[in-house]
Protein backbone atom coordinates (compact mmCIF):
# COMPACT_ATOMS: atom_id res chain seq x y z
CA UNK A 1 0.00 0.00 0.00
CA UNK A 2 2.86 2.39 0.78
CA UNK A 3 4.02 2.30 -2.85
CA UNK A 4 0.53 3.16 -4.06
CA UNK A 5 0.21 6.05 -1.61
CA UNK A 6 3.57 7.55 -2.55
CA UNK A 7 2.44 7.66 -6.18
CA UNK A 8 -0.54 9.82 -5.22
CA UNK A 9 -0.34 13.62 -4.95
CA UNK A 10 0.56 14.81 -1.45
CA UNK A 11 -2.81 16.49 -0.87
CA UNK A 12 -4.43 13.09 -1.28
CA UNK A 13 -1.89 10.77 0.35
CA UNK A 14 -1.25 12.86 3.48
CA UNK A 15 -2.52 11.15 6.61
CA UNK A 16 -4.23 8.27 4.78
CA UNK A 17 -4.29 5.03 6.78
CA UNK A 18 -5.74 2.70 4.14
CA UNK A 19 -6.66 2.73 0.47
CA UNK A 20 -8.52 -0.04 -1.30
CA UNK A 21 -8.61 -1.74 -3.69
CA UNK A 22 -4.91 -1.82 -4.52
CA UNK A 23 -3.76 -2.56 -8.06
CA UNK A 24 -1.32 -5.47 -7.64
CA UNK A 25 -0.62 -6.32 -11.30
CA UNK A 26 -1.09 -5.01 -14.83
CA UNK A 27 -4.45 -6.74 -15.24
CA UNK A 28 -5.77 -4.58 -12.39
CA UNK A 29 -4.28 -1.29 -13.55
CA UNK A 30 -7.79 0.08 -14.10
CA UNK A 31 -8.24 -0.26 -10.33
CA UNK A 32 -5.74 2.51 -9.67
CA UNK A 33 -7.08 5.63 -7.99
CA UNK A 34 -4.27 7.59 -9.64
CA UNK A 35 -5.54 6.46 -13.05
CA UNK A 36 -9.10 7.41 -12.10
CA UNK A 37 -7.86 10.88 -11.10
CA UNK A 38 -6.03 11.21 -14.41
CA UNK A 39 -9.11 10.18 -16.38
CA UNK A 40 -11.23 12.70 -14.49
CA UNK A 41 -8.74 15.45 -15.30
CA UNK A 42 -8.59 14.60 -19.03
CA UNK A 43 -12.36 14.34 -19.38
CA UNK A 44 -13.02 17.37 -17.19
CA UNK A 45 -15.55 15.26 -15.27
CA UNK A 46 -14.87 15.52 -11.52
CA UNK A 47 -14.90 12.48 -9.27
CA UNK A 48 -17.85 12.10 -6.95
CA UNK A 49 -16.43 11.74 -3.45
CA UNK A 50 -18.86 10.49 -0.83
CA UNK A 51 -18.82 11.03 2.91
CA UNK A 52 -21.76 9.91 4.99
CA UNK A 53 -22.42 11.29 8.46
CA UNK A 54 -25.13 10.27 10.89
CA UNK A 55 -26.24 13.29 12.94
CA UNK A 56 -26.51 11.41 16.23
CA UNK A 57 -24.97 14.23 18.30
CA UNK A 58 -24.80 18.01 18.21
CA UNK A 59 -21.07 18.72 18.27
CA UNK A 60 -18.30 18.17 15.73
CA UNK A 61 -14.80 17.99 17.22
CA UNK A 62 -11.29 17.93 15.77
CA UNK A 63 -11.33 14.14 15.61
CA UNK A 64 -14.21 14.36 13.15
CA UNK A 65 -12.51 17.16 11.22
CA UNK A 66 -9.76 14.89 9.82
CA UNK A 67 -12.14 13.29 7.37
CA UNK A 68 -13.80 16.59 6.46
CA UNK A 69 -10.37 18.08 5.73
CA UNK A 70 -9.73 15.27 3.25
CA UNK A 71 -13.11 15.90 1.64
CA UNK A 72 -12.21 19.59 1.37
CA UNK A 73 -8.90 18.61 -0.27
CA UNK A 74 -10.86 16.80 -2.98
CA UNK A 75 -13.03 19.90 -3.42
CA UNK A 76 -9.99 22.15 -3.77
CA UNK A 77 -8.62 19.75 -6.40
CA UNK A 78 -11.77 20.29 -8.46
CA UNK A 79 -13.85 17.26 -7.48
CA UNK A 80 -17.42 17.09 -6.18
CA UNK A 81 -17.97 16.34 -2.51
CA UNK A 82 -21.15 14.38 -1.79
CA UNK A 83 -22.02 14.94 1.86
CA UNK A 84 -24.74 12.50 2.83
CA UNK A 85 -26.70 13.40 5.93
CA UNK A 86 -27.84 10.03 7.24
CA UNK A 87 -31.17 11.30 8.48
CA UNK A 88 -32.74 7.91 7.75
CA UNK A 89 -29.88 5.67 8.92
CA UNK A 90 -29.44 7.78 12.06
CA UNK A 91 -32.77 6.41 13.21
CA UNK A 92 -31.14 2.95 13.19
CA UNK A 93 -27.70 3.98 14.44
CA UNK A 94 -24.32 2.75 13.24
CA UNK A 95 -23.35 -0.34 15.30
CA UNK A 96 -19.64 0.32 14.64
CA UNK A 97 -17.76 0.51 17.93
CA UNK A 98 -20.87 -0.29 19.96
CA UNK A 99 -21.24 -3.23 22.32
CA UNK A 100 -25.02 -2.84 22.51
CA UNK A 101 -27.92 -1.62 20.41
CA UNK A 102 -28.06 2.17 19.98
CA UNK A 103 -31.05 4.18 21.14
CA UNK A 104 -33.05 5.26 18.10
CA UNK A 105 -33.46 9.01 17.48
CA UNK A 106 -36.64 10.81 16.49
CA UNK A 107 -36.82 12.60 13.11
CA UNK A 108 -36.93 15.93 14.97
CA UNK A 109 -33.72 15.18 16.87
CA UNK A 110 -32.00 14.09 13.67
CA UNK A 111 -33.00 17.26 11.80
CA UNK A 112 -31.86 19.54 14.63
CA UNK A 113 -28.50 17.78 14.80
CA UNK A 114 -28.17 17.94 11.00
CA UNK A 115 -28.47 21.72 10.97
CA UNK A 116 -25.97 22.01 13.83
CA UNK A 117 -23.50 19.89 11.87
CA UNK A 118 -23.86 21.94 8.68
CA UNK A 119 -23.37 25.19 10.59
CA UNK A 120 -20.20 23.86 12.20
CA UNK A 121 -18.91 22.68 8.82
CA UNK A 122 -19.17 26.24 7.54
CA UNK A 123 -22.60 26.71 6.03
CA UNK A 124 -23.06 30.45 5.54
CA UNK A 125 -19.39 31.21 6.28
CA UNK A 126 -16.51 32.20 4.01
CA UNK A 127 -14.65 29.21 2.62
CA UNK A 128 -11.36 30.49 4.09
CA UNK A 129 -12.35 29.50 7.63
CA UNK A 130 -14.91 26.77 6.93
CA UNK A 131 -14.14 23.06 6.80
CA UNK A 132 -16.04 22.56 3.54
CA UNK A 133 -16.44 24.79 0.51
CA UNK A 134 -20.13 25.68 0.42
CA UNK A 135 -19.56 28.57 -2.03
CA UNK A 136 -17.96 27.24 -5.23
CA UNK A 137 -20.55 25.97 -7.69
CA UNK A 138 -20.39 22.25 -8.37
CA UNK A 139 -18.08 21.43 -5.47
CA UNK A 140 -20.64 20.25 -2.92
CA UNK A 141 -23.87 18.29 -2.91
CA UNK A 142 -25.62 17.91 0.44
CA UNK A 143 -28.01 14.98 0.29
CA UNK A 144 -30.19 13.24 2.86
CA UNK A 145 -30.48 9.50 2.49
CA UNK A 146 -34.17 9.67 3.34
CA UNK A 147 -34.51 10.88 -0.28
CA UNK A 148 -34.11 7.30 -1.50
CA UNK A 149 -34.43 5.09 1.59
CA UNK A 150 -37.70 6.42 2.98
CA UNK A 151 -39.53 5.34 -0.16
CA UNK A 152 -38.28 1.74 -0.09
CA UNK A 153 -41.10 -0.80 -0.19
CA UNK A 154 -40.91 -4.32 1.22
CA UNK A 155 -39.89 -5.81 -2.14
CA UNK A 156 -36.90 -3.44 -2.36
CA UNK A 157 -35.86 -4.14 1.23
CA UNK A 158 -35.99 -7.90 0.64
CA UNK A 159 -33.97 -7.44 -2.55
CA UNK A 160 -31.38 -5.44 -0.61
CA UNK A 161 -31.21 -8.11 2.10
CA UNK A 162 -30.55 -10.73 -0.57
CA UNK A 163 -27.30 -8.96 -1.49
CA UNK A 164 -25.62 -10.00 1.77
CA UNK A 165 -25.45 -12.95 4.17
CA UNK A 166 -25.53 -13.46 7.92
CA UNK A 167 -21.96 -14.73 7.65
CA UNK A 168 -20.85 -11.44 6.10
CA UNK A 169 -22.56 -9.49 8.86
CA UNK A 170 -20.96 -11.58 11.60
CA UNK A 171 -17.58 -10.86 10.04
CA UNK A 172 -18.05 -7.33 11.34
CA UNK A 173 -16.09 -7.20 14.60
CA UNK A 174 -18.78 -5.57 16.71
CA UNK A 175 -21.42 -8.08 15.61
CA UNK A 176 -19.02 -11.01 16.10
CA UNK A 177 -18.12 -9.91 19.63
CA UNK A 178 -21.74 -9.44 20.62
CA UNK A 179 -22.72 -12.79 19.10
CA UNK A 180 -19.98 -14.73 20.92
CA UNK A 181 -20.68 -12.95 24.22
CA UNK A 182 -24.40 -13.60 23.99
CA UNK A 183 -25.26 -9.89 23.75
CA UNK A 184 -28.34 -9.33 21.62
CA UNK A 185 -28.13 -8.04 18.05
CA UNK A 186 -31.36 -6.47 16.82
CA UNK A 187 -32.24 -7.47 13.26
CA UNK A 188 -32.67 -3.85 12.19
CA UNK A 189 -28.95 -3.31 12.92
CA UNK A 190 -28.09 -5.59 9.99
CA UNK A 191 -29.89 -3.10 7.77
CA UNK A 192 -27.53 -0.26 8.67
CA UNK A 193 -24.50 -1.35 6.59
CA UNK A 194 -26.81 -2.37 3.73
CA UNK A 195 -28.55 1.01 3.67
CA UNK A 196 -25.24 2.82 4.07
CA UNK A 197 -23.83 0.77 1.22
CA UNK A 198 -26.83 1.58 -0.97
CA UNK A 199 -26.11 5.27 -0.43
CA UNK A 200 -23.07 4.78 -2.69
CA UNK A 201 -25.36 3.41 -5.40
CA UNK A 202 -27.82 6.30 -5.03
CA UNK A 203 -25.16 9.00 -5.48
CA UNK A 204 -22.93 6.98 -7.87
CA UNK A 205 -19.84 7.49 -5.73
CA UNK A 206 -16.35 7.12 -7.21
CA UNK A 207 -14.61 7.39 -3.84
CA UNK A 208 -15.87 7.00 -0.29
CA UNK A 209 -14.09 8.46 2.72
CA UNK A 210 -14.30 6.93 6.17
CA UNK A 211 -12.44 6.31 9.40
CA UNK A 212 -10.37 3.15 9.76
CA UNK A 213 -13.21 1.71 11.84
CA UNK A 214 -15.56 2.10 8.86
CA UNK A 215 -13.87 -0.31 6.44
CA UNK A 216 -16.69 -2.86 6.64
CA UNK A 217 -19.30 -0.23 5.73
CA UNK A 218 -17.20 1.28 2.91
CA UNK A 219 -16.55 -2.19 1.48
CA UNK A 220 -20.30 -2.86 1.62
CA UNK A 221 -20.75 0.17 -0.62
CA UNK A 222 -18.43 -1.44 -3.18
CA UNK A 223 -20.43 -4.68 -3.00
CA UNK A 224 -23.71 -2.85 -3.48
CA UNK A 225 -22.40 -0.97 -6.51
CA UNK A 226 -21.33 -4.25 -8.12
CA UNK A 227 -24.80 -5.72 -7.50
CA UNK A 228 -26.36 -2.69 -9.20
CA UNK A 229 -23.93 -2.76 -12.15
CA UNK A 230 -21.92 0.30 -11.15
CA UNK A 231 -18.15 0.64 -11.12
CA UNK A 232 -17.12 0.02 -7.47
CA UNK A 233 -15.90 3.01 -5.50
CA UNK A 234 -12.46 3.37 -3.97
CA UNK A 235 -12.25 3.37 -0.18
CA UNK A 236 -9.99 5.95 1.45
CA UNK A 237 -9.70 5.55 5.22
CA UNK A 238 -8.33 8.07 7.72
CA UNK A 239 -6.91 7.35 11.18
CA UNK A 240 -8.63 7.96 14.50
CA UNK A 241 -7.30 11.06 16.28
CA UNK A 242 -5.97 10.53 19.81
CA UNK A 243 -7.60 12.92 22.28
CA UNK A 244 -6.11 15.58 24.53
CA UNK A 245 -5.16 12.93 27.09
CA UNK A 246 -2.71 11.46 24.58
CA UNK A 247 -4.04 7.95 25.17
CA UNK A 248 -7.61 7.31 24.05
CA UNK A 249 -9.40 8.34 20.88
CA UNK A 250 -10.93 11.80 20.88
CA UNK A 251 -14.46 11.37 22.17
CA UNK A 252 -16.93 13.65 23.88
CA UNK A 253 -17.81 10.88 26.34
CA UNK A 254 -14.15 10.77 27.43
CA UNK A 255 -13.91 14.54 27.93
CA UNK A 256 -10.78 14.84 25.74
CA UNK A 257 -12.13 16.81 22.79
CA UNK A 258 -11.73 20.19 21.14
CA UNK A 259 -15.01 21.29 19.57
CA UNK A 260 -15.13 23.17 16.29
CA UNK A 261 -17.60 25.62 17.78
CA UNK A 262 -15.26 26.60 20.64
CA UNK A 263 -13.90 30.13 20.71
CA UNK A 264 -10.31 30.73 19.64
CA UNK A 265 -8.90 31.11 23.16
CA UNK A 266 -10.47 27.88 24.39
CA UNK A 267 -9.33 25.99 21.29
CA UNK A 268 -5.77 27.29 21.47
CA UNK A 269 -5.46 26.73 25.22
CA UNK A 270 -6.49 23.09 24.91
CA UNK A 271 -4.26 22.38 21.90
CA UNK A 272 -1.24 23.96 23.56
CA UNK A 273 -1.36 21.17 26.15
CA UNK A 274 -1.47 18.23 23.74
CA UNK A 275 1.19 15.70 24.88
CA UNK A 276 4.51 15.89 23.02
CA UNK A 277 3.99 12.38 21.66
CA UNK A 278 0.94 13.52 19.67
CA UNK A 279 2.00 16.94 18.38
CA UNK A 280 3.44 15.69 15.06
CA UNK A 281 0.34 13.57 14.57
CA UNK A 282 -1.90 16.60 15.09
CA UNK A 283 0.21 18.62 12.65
CA UNK A 284 -0.04 15.89 10.02
CA UNK A 285 -3.76 15.22 10.38
CA UNK A 286 -5.10 18.67 11.24
CA UNK A 287 -2.91 21.04 9.19
CA UNK A 288 -1.19 21.31 5.82
CA UNK A 289 2.08 22.40 7.46
CA UNK A 290 5.29 20.88 6.13
CA UNK A 291 6.89 19.53 9.29
CA UNK A 292 10.01 17.78 7.98
CA UNK A 293 12.13 20.92 8.01
CA UNK A 294 10.90 22.38 11.30
CA UNK A 295 13.67 23.00 13.86
CA UNK A 296 11.58 23.75 16.94
CA UNK A 297 11.92 22.42 20.44
CA UNK A 298 9.01 20.49 21.96
CA UNK A 299 7.36 23.51 23.57
CA UNK A 300 7.71 25.66 20.46
CA UNK A 301 6.25 22.85 18.38
CA UNK A 302 3.20 22.64 20.66
CA UNK A 303 2.57 26.36 20.23
CA UNK A 304 3.15 26.17 16.48
CA UNK A 305 0.62 23.36 16.16
CA UNK A 306 -1.95 25.07 18.40
CA UNK A 307 -1.66 28.31 16.43
CA UNK A 308 -2.01 26.66 13.03
CA UNK A 309 -4.98 24.49 13.97
CA UNK A 310 -6.79 27.41 15.64
CA UNK A 311 -6.10 29.63 12.62
CA UNK A 312 -7.97 27.23 10.36
CA UNK A 313 -11.24 27.87 12.14
CA UNK A 314 -10.82 31.44 13.36
CA UNK A 315 -8.31 33.04 10.99
CA UNK A 316 -4.64 33.76 11.68
CA UNK A 317 -5.07 37.19 13.27
CA UNK A 318 -7.64 35.91 15.79
CA UNK A 319 -5.49 32.84 16.50
CA UNK A 320 -2.48 35.05 17.27
CA UNK A 321 -4.56 37.08 19.72
CA UNK A 322 -5.66 33.83 21.37
CA UNK A 323 -2.02 32.75 21.61
CA UNK A 324 -1.10 35.98 23.42
CA UNK A 325 -4.09 35.74 25.76
CA UNK A 326 -3.29 32.10 26.53
CA UNK A 327 0.27 33.07 27.39
CA UNK A 328 -1.05 35.54 29.96
CA UNK A 329 -3.45 32.97 31.37
CA UNK A 330 -0.84 30.30 31.98
CA UNK A 331 1.80 32.59 33.38
CA UNK A 332 0.52 35.61 34.95
CA UNK A 333 3.31 35.68 33.46
CA UNK A 334 4.80 32.35 34.16
CA UNK A 335 6.51 30.20 31.57
CA UNK A 336 4.39 27.06 31.38
CA UNK A 337 1.18 25.43 32.52
CA UNK A 338 3.23 23.43 35.04
CA UNK A 339 4.00 26.67 36.92
CA UNK A 340 0.34 27.28 37.72
CA UNK A 341 -0.61 26.19 41.28
CA UNK A 342 -2.42 22.86 41.45
CA UNK A 343 -5.83 22.58 43.10
CA UNK A 344 -7.50 19.23 43.81
CA UNK A 345 -11.22 18.57 43.38
CA UNK A 346 -11.07 15.19 45.13
CA UNK A 347 -13.44 16.40 47.86
CA UNK A 348 -16.02 17.78 45.43
CA UNK A 349 -19.13 15.69 44.82
CA UNK A 350 -19.93 15.46 41.11
CA UNK A 351 -22.08 16.40 39.30
CA UNK A 352 -21.71 19.94 40.59
CA UNK A 353 -22.67 23.41 39.43
CA UNK A 354 -20.08 26.09 38.68
CA UNK A 355 -20.99 28.31 41.64
CA UNK A 356 -20.83 25.36 44.03
CA UNK A 357 -17.46 24.28 42.64
CA UNK A 358 -15.89 27.68 43.34
CA UNK A 359 -17.14 27.79 46.91
CA UNK A 360 -16.27 24.11 47.53
CA UNK A 361 -12.62 24.53 46.53
CA UNK A 362 -12.26 27.76 48.47
CA UNK A 363 -11.86 30.24 45.63
CA UNK A 364 -15.02 32.08 46.69
CA UNK A 365 -16.14 32.83 50.22
CA UNK A 366 -19.76 31.83 49.61
CA UNK A 367 -22.15 30.54 47.00
CA UNK A 368 -23.65 34.00 46.50
CA UNK A 369 -20.17 35.47 45.97
CA UNK A 370 -19.42 32.71 43.46
CA UNK A 371 -22.63 33.47 41.57
CA UNK A 372 -21.77 37.19 41.34
CA UNK A 373 -18.25 36.46 40.10
CA UNK A 374 -19.47 34.07 37.42
CA UNK A 375 -22.24 36.38 36.23
CA UNK A 376 -19.65 39.16 36.04
CA UNK A 377 -17.54 37.14 33.61
CA UNK A 378 -14.72 36.30 36.02
CA UNK A 379 -14.65 32.53 35.44
CA UNK A 380 -12.82 30.83 32.58
CA UNK A 381 -11.98 27.16 32.11
CA UNK A 382 -9.09 26.70 29.68
CA UNK A 383 -9.82 30.16 28.39
CA UNK A 384 -13.53 29.52 27.80
CA UNK A 385 -15.71 31.99 29.69
CA UNK A 386 -18.54 30.52 31.76
CA UNK A 387 -21.35 32.97 32.53
CA UNK A 388 -23.99 30.62 33.91
CA UNK A 389 -23.58 29.95 37.66
CA UNK A 390 -25.63 26.77 37.15
CA UNK A 391 -23.33 25.40 34.44
CA UNK A 392 -22.90 21.74 35.39
CA UNK A 393 -19.69 19.73 35.55
CA UNK A 394 -20.96 16.18 35.24
CA UNK A 395 -17.75 14.43 36.19
CA UNK A 396 -14.18 15.14 37.31
CA UNK A 397 -12.99 14.55 33.75
CA UNK A 398 -14.89 17.69 32.70
CA UNK A 399 -12.38 19.83 34.58
CA UNK A 400 -9.31 17.82 35.67
CA UNK A 401 -6.15 18.90 33.85
CA UNK A 402 -7.63 22.24 32.84
CA UNK A 403 -6.70 25.77 33.87
CA UNK A 404 -9.30 27.55 35.99
CA UNK A 405 -9.05 31.33 35.91
CA UNK A 406 -10.99 33.55 38.31
CA UNK A 407 -10.60 37.24 37.63
CA UNK A 408 -7.32 38.59 36.27
CA UNK A 409 -4.88 37.12 38.78
CA UNK A 410 -6.17 33.80 40.12
CA UNK A 411 -5.10 30.70 38.15
CA UNK A 412 -5.32 27.08 39.24
CA UNK A 413 -4.47 23.85 37.42
CA UNK A 414 -7.18 21.38 38.44
CA UNK A 415 -6.20 17.88 39.55
CA UNK A 416 -8.19 14.95 40.91
Curated annotation (Swiss-Prot):
Which positions does the motif 'HIGH' region occupy? Answer: 55-64
Q: Subcellular location, in the record's words?
A: Cytoplasm
Question: Which residues hold ATP?
Answer: 252
Does the keyword field hold NAD? no
Residues covered by the S4 RNA-binding domain = 352-416
Q: Name its GO BP terms in alphabetical order.
A: tyrosyl-tRNA aminoacylation
Recorded hits in PROSITE patterns, A to Z, give: S4
Q: What is its EC number?
A: 6.1.1.1
Please give the GO cellular component terms listed in this UniProt entry.
cytosol
Q: Which reaction does it catalyse?
A: tRNA(Tyr) + L-tyrosine + ATP = L-tyrosyl-tRNA(Tyr) + AMP + diphosphate + H(+)
Q: Which enzyme class, named as a word?
A: ligase
Q: Which Pfam families match?
A: SYY_C-terminal, tRNA-synt_1b
Name the source's superkingdom: Bacteria
Extract the GO molecular function terms from the UniProt entry.
ATP binding; RNA binding; tyrosine-tRNA ligase activity
Question: Sorted alphabetically, which keywords does the UniProt record give?
Answer: Aminoacyl-tRNA synthetase, ATP-binding, Cytoplasm, Ligase, Nucleotide-binding, Protein biosynthesis, RNA-binding
InterPro entries xref list: aa-tRNA-synth_Ic, Rossmann-like_a/b/a_fold, S4_RNA-bd_sf, SYY-like_C, Tyr-tRNA-ligase, Tyr-tRNA-ligase_bac-type, Tyr-tRNA-ligase_bac_2
UniProt short sequence motif 'KMSKS' region, positions renumbered to this chain:
249-253
Family membership: Belongs to the class-I aminoacyl-tRNA synthetase family. TyrS type 2 subfamily.
- PANTHER family cross-referenced by the UniProt entry: TYROSINE--TRNA LIGASE (PTHR11766:SF1), TYROSYL-TRNA SYNTHETASE (PTHR11766)
Tell me, in a sentence or two, what this protein's role is: Catalyzes the attachment of tyrosine to tRNA(Tyr) in a two-step reaction: tyrosine is first activated by ATP to form Tyr-AMP and then transferred to the acceptor end of tRNA(Tyr).
Assembly mode: Homodimer.
Q: What is this protein called?
A: Tyrosine--tRNA ligase
Species for this entry: Prochlorococcus marinus (strain SARG / CCMP1375 / SS120)
Q: What is the lineage of its organism?
A: Bacteria, Bacillati, Cyanobacteriota, Cyanophyceae, Synechococcales
Task: State which gene encodes it.
Answer: tyrS
Amino acid sequence: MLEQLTSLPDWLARGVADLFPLATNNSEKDQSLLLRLSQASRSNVPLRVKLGIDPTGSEIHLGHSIIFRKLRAFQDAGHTAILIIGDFTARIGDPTGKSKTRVQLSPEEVEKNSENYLNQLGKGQSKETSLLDFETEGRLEVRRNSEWLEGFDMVQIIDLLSKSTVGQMLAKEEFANRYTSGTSIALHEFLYPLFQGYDSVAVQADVELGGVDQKFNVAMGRDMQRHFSQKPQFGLLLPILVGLDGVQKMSKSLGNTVGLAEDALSMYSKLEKVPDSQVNNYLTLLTDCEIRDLTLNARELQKFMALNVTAQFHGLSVAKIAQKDASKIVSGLKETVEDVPVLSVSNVNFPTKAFHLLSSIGLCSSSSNARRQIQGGALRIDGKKILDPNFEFVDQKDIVGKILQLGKKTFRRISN
